[in-house]
């Protein structure tokens, strides 16, 4: 029995993770982590008890049994979206896929004296609203492709006597394993507009007015008329405007449903000038204008010409390619399943500037140490007044080398292997930025200032380097210092080579 319609539905008490649910076909499902909630129900990751998988490929949507939206969605899948029916449609229409989520089962369960209804669905990826929030809008080609994919879905569900009624970016989700596929989800407001082949009659009911998501809902819904096929294609038109420009003409009036209804009426009545005047200068939206003009001329019970609508959105018949959710400012990376593992915290917290190879990591540490040395040379007072930060052994060794060389004041060195021009590890590099990666500056050379009667100015280039050292006339104290530092440097070099070998 269908639950009674209520104005507001109660959000159910969450079920414990690990609870086993039995569907009507005898399949057993283990609840995983709760990943979402809506105005009426909760969404959990789920695992078949006989096939546990770290990458959860199923979700369970549940609500109190007396609630209504999940019941409506369940009836839609049972009547219109069985897997074998979808596959048959794909073959007949020669589609590569159809963007309707796969339905696996349903059932009832009890918890703390309350009865819950649940349904098992395939797991999908990120929704388009999150991508839209990051971008502010999509590329025109992406918007047109999304429209064509949604027309494929709408044609199928309309042929099976249903309308969706709530098309929006939050209800469009990318495939979990293939982000170039998009699915229309959430059929809680789906409506059987043509039961047993008899189309509902046009009848306005102010008590049911402004139903749906106010930004995108159709003029029929504003008037309290039951949704029809033209309602769905009209809603899709508003969505495409929003995806392309990141805004709608009535977005400042959302607190006043009547004002939104008036703005939509004016937009459709004054096409094409209304859209062309409102759209940003230099933008091209002729396809959307033609689409809305066609939709506006549909009668309440007309069947849309889906092929004509797709031809309007793709007049050249270009094959549909990958979906690109990016703008001129940034590019959104849609994660693959390997990056979406729900029970692997390391995968979700991976630093943006982490490099996979060992050698670049070492270069990064050395470059940071070099930058610190340069800052100490240029701002000694600031560094002395600032608390010392913890250093690793590699950094301490570099500081020791600097102290030794400054005390000896007798050697001139060229940059070591740490300063090679091919380095791409700029100090404190933010790898999430799209700025060109700049090469690090070379290490500063230690210049020798001649003092006393020493005649050697470049000991490295001298062919008699070590004989010159032993022929120098030095005091006993200076000789002791030279031997001491020589042994120290030799030992430190051994430690450095050992450290590099085992890193």
From Swiss-Prot:
Q: Which cysteines are joined by disulfide bonds?
A: none
Binding residues annotated for ATP, in chain numbering = 35-43, 61
Q: Which GO terms describe its cellular component?
A: cytoplasm; endoplasmic reticulum; endoplasmic reticulum membrane; membrane; mitochondrial membrane; nuclear envelope; nucleus; protein-containing complex
Broad EC category: transferase
Which EC number(s) are documented for this chain? 2.7.11.1
Q: How does it sit in the membrane?
A: Single-pass type IV membrane protein
SUPFAM superfamilies (UniProt xref): Protein kinase-like (PK-like) (SSF56112)
Instruction: Please list the reactions this protein catalyses.
Output: L-seryl-[protein] + ATP = O-phospho-L-seryl-[protein] + ADP + H(+); L-threonyl-[protein] + ATP = O-phospho-L-threonyl-[protein] + ADP + H(+)
The record's Gene Ontology biological-process terms are: cellular response to oxidative stress; regulation of interleukin-1-mediated signaling pathway; regulation of MAPK cascade
The answer to whether keyword Phosphoprotein applies is yes
The post-translation modification note in this UniProt entry reads: Autophosphorylated.
UniProt family annotation: Belongs to the protein kinase superfamily. CK1 Ser/Thr protein kinase family. VRK subfamily.
Query: According to its UniProt entry, what is the function of this protein?
Result: Serine/threonine kinase that regulates several signal transduction pathways. Modulates the stress response to hypoxia and cytokines, such as interleukin-1 beta (IL1B) and this is dependent on its interaction with MAPK8IP1, which assembles mitogen-activated protein kinase (MAPK) complexes. Inhibition of signal transmission mediated by the assembly of MAPK8IP1-MAPK complexes reduces JNK phosphorylation and JUN-dependent transcription. Phosphorylates histone H3. Phosphorylates 'Thr-18' of p53/TP53, and thereby increases its stability and activity.
Assembly and binders: Interacts with MAP3K7, MAP2K7, MAP2K1, KSR1, RAN and MAPK8IP1.
Q: What is this protein called?
A: Serine/threonine-protein kinase VRK2
């Amino acid at each position: 029995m269908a639950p009674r319609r209520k104005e507001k539905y109660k959000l159910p008490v969450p079920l414990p993770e690990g609870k086993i649910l039995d569907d009507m076909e005898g399949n057993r499902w283990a609840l995983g982590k709760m990943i979402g909630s809506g105005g009426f129900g909760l969404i959990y990751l789920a695992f078949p008890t006989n096939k546990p998988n770290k990458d959860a490929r199923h979700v369970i949507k549940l609500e109190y049994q007396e609630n209504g939206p999940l019941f409506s969605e369940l009836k839609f899948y049972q009547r219109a979206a069985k897997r074998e029916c979808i596959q048959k449609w794909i073959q007949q229409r020669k589609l590569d896929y159809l963007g309707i989520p796969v339905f696996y089962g349903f059932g009832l369960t009890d918890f703390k004296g309350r009865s819950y209804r649940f349904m098992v669905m395939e797991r999908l990826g990120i929704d388009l609203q999150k991508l839209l929030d990051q971008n502010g809008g999509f590329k025109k080609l992406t918007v047109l492709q999304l429209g064509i994919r949604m027309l494929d879905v709408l044609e199928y569900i309309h042929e099976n006597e249903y309308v969706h009624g709530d098309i929006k970016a939050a209800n469009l989700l990318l495939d979990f394993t293939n982000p170039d596929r998009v699915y229309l989800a959430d059929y809680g407001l789906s409506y059987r507009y043509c039961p047993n082949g008899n189309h509902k009659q046009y009848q306005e009911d102010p008590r049911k007015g402004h139903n749906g998501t106010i930004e995108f809902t159709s003029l029929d819904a504003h008037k309290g008329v039951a949704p029809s096929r033209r309602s769905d294609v009209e809603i899709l038109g508003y969505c495409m405007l929003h995806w392309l420009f990141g805004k709608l003409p009535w977005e400042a009036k959302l607190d006043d449903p009547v004002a939104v209804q008036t703005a939509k009426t004016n937009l459709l009545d004054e096409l094409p000038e209304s859209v062309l005047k409102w759209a940003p200068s230099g933008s091209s939206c002729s396809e959307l204008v033609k689409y809305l003009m066609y939709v506006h001329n549909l009668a309440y019970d007309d069947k849309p010409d889906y092929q004509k609508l797709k031809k309007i959105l793709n007049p050249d018949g270009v094959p549909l390619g990958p979906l690109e959710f990016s703008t001129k400012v940034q590019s959104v990376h849609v994660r693959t399943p390997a990056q979406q593992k729900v029970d692997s915290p390391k995968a979700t917290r991976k630093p943006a500037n982490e490099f996979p190879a060992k050698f670049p990591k070492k270069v990064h540490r050395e470059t940071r140490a070099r930058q610190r040395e340069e800052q100490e040379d240029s701002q000694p007072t600031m560094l002395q007044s600032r608390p010392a930060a913890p250093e690793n052994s590699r950094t301490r060794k570099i500081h020791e080398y600097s102290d030794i060389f400054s005390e000896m004041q007798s050697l001139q060195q060229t940059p070591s292997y740490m300063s090679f021009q091919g380095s791409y590890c700029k100090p404190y590099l933010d790898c999430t930025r799209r700025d060109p990666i700049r090469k690090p500056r070379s290490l500063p050379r230690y210049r020798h200032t001649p003092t006393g009667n020493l005649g050697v100015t470049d000991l490295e280039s001298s062919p008699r380097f070590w004989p010159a050292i032993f022929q120098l006339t030095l005091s006993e104290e200076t000789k002791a210092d030279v031997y001491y530092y020589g042994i120290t440097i030799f030992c430190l070099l051994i430690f450095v080579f050992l450290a590099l070998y085992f890193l």
